[in-house]
Amino acid sequence: MSLSSSAPWLKYYGNVPHHLSYPQKTIYQMVKAAAERNPKLPAYEFMGKKTTFTQFMQKIDETAQAFLAMGIKKGDRVTICMPNCPQALHAFYGLNRIGAVSNMIHPLSAAGEIRFYLNFSHSKCILTLDQFYAK
């Protein structure tokens, strides 16, 4: 089967690659490699405060250890129902570090949607803010 018959839309894409190669690494391993190359560069900025890759990795590792202490292990699913904030990043990468699965849910989702995705994902626990607990 030719590329044009299996993916006919590609003829409209212009001069872009039709296939991308991805490294066989976890997202945590990729961030760790970036931190090793650029330890003093900002990994992110939140509300005017910059966090270096070194600081970011420290928070990720601390968060991963906290999950392990809670009994979260490789293969477990954990829902993160938080706004875009550093703690959500630390949780996402910390879970990836230990091999757990992050189930991201937008905190402004309707209560029924949150319930559906919690049940569907079989999450072992949920991380959220007190403002969203009532949902």
Regions found by a protein language model. Give the residues of each.
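Flexible, non-catalytic linker and terminal segments flanking ANL/adenylate-forming cores
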Residues: M1-Q24
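Short, flexible active-site loop motifs that bind/organize anionic cofactors or intermediates
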Residues: P17, F46, F53, M104, ...
